[in-house]
Each structure stands twice: as C-alpha cells, then as structure tokens.
Amino acid sequence: MAENSAATPAAKPKRSKALKKSTDHPKYSDMILAAVQAEKSRSGSSRQSIQKYIKNHYKVGENADSQIKLSIKRLVTSGALKQTKGVGASGSFRLAKADEGKKPAKKPKKEIKKAVSPKKVAKPKKAAKSPAKAKKPKVAEKKVKKVAKKKPAPSPKKAKKTKTVKAKPVRASKVKKAKPSKPKAKASPKKSGRKK
C-alpha cells in the first residue's frame, strides 16, 4: 500500500512539466508566420521547412505537426498566408502582405485589356439596338393613321343629320305662307266689280 501511494505522487509532476513545456512557445500561427518571413523564398516555404524551423527555434511538443497543419489551413482561410502550390496544408506558402505589394503593378495591365474589349462588344450592341428603335416609330405611325381615318368618318354623319332637320321646317313655312296669298288674289277682283 505504501509503495502504491509513493508511486502516484511521482507521476503528477511529470504531467505538470509537460504542460509547462507547451506554454513556453508562442502561438503556432505566429511561429508559422515567423518561419515564412525567415526563409524569404520566391517560390514560397513548404510545410516541412516550416516544421523544421519551428522545432529548431521553439520548444514544441510531440503533436506539433498536426497543430501546424491546422494553423496553416486557418491562416490560408483568413488571408494571412497565400498558397502558391499544392492543396490544403501541403504545398508552399507565402505571406499575403508580400504578395499585395507586388500585385498592384500587374492589375493596371489587366484593367487596360478589359477596357479595350468592351468597346468591341459595344459596337455590335449599338447596331442591334438602332434597327429596333427604327421599327418602333413605324408602328406608332400606323396607329396614328388608323386613328386619323376613323375620326373623319363620324363627322359627315352628324352633318347629314343637321341638314335634314333644318330642311323640314323650311318646307312647312313655305306651304303656310302660300295658302293665305291665294284668297287675297280672289277677293281683289270682286271689289273692283262693285265699284264699277
């Protein structure tokens, strides 16, 4: 019983020492960025070279390789690192800041090419739009002509109605005036005969 109790306290300090060793080094992301900066290779630094640099300069545990892979993937997704070759944690990597300084010189060339290409595409589009615009006014003119033809048609009908209405009272007035004139003519010879 005494031997077992003496063995257990001896095991506890070993675990505490292992925890202390893991806290001696900075974050894996910081160590990876430092390794890439130290190499300064044009093609980018590989994962194996990053691991060697970290193991040589920092006190790292046995599970350092797996944690380096995870931290590399996180840095790539966040944009701190850019992968020049390979997929995932394998391949070569560069710092994103170094690439941003080089890329602006290349971007203006691409923008000039893009500015030239739309001009060529724009010419056929304008030609295609112009006949469509020319066709639309023709349709509008046809509609105006049809409307103009329909409008004069009702106007003569109205004129005919007004003429027929005016003609009827004129005829009636002539007939009425003619009737009283006849008896006056008959009465005049009678008066002349009496005087003689």
UniProtKB/Swiss-Prot annotation:
Stored Pfam families: Linker_histone (PF00538)
GO cellular component, one term: nucleus
Record's compositionally biased regions (Basic residues): 104-196
Xref: PROSITE patterns: H15
Cysteine pairs bridged by disulfides in the record: none
GO biological process, one term: nucleosome assembly
Keywords attached to this entry: Chromosome, DNA condensation, DNA-binding, Nucleus
Region annotated Disordered, chain positions: 1-29, 86-196
Domain H15: 24-97
Localization per Swiss-Prot or TrEMBL: Nucleus; Chromosome
Molecular-function GO terms, alphabetical: double-stranded DNA binding; nucleosomal DNA binding; structural constituent of chromatin
SMART domains found in the cross-reference section: H15
Keyword field contains DNA-binding: yes
Protein family (similarity comment): Belongs to the histone H1/H5 family.
Record's function text: Histones H1 are necessary for the condensation of nucleosome chains into higher-order structures. The histones H1.0 are found in cells that are in terminal stages of differentiation or that have low rates of cell division.
PANTHER family membership: HISTONE H1, HISTONE H1.0
Protein name as annotated: Histone H1.0-B
Organism, scientific name: Xenopus laevis (African clawed frog)
Lineage of source species: Eukaryota, Metazoa, Chordata, Craniata, Vertebrata
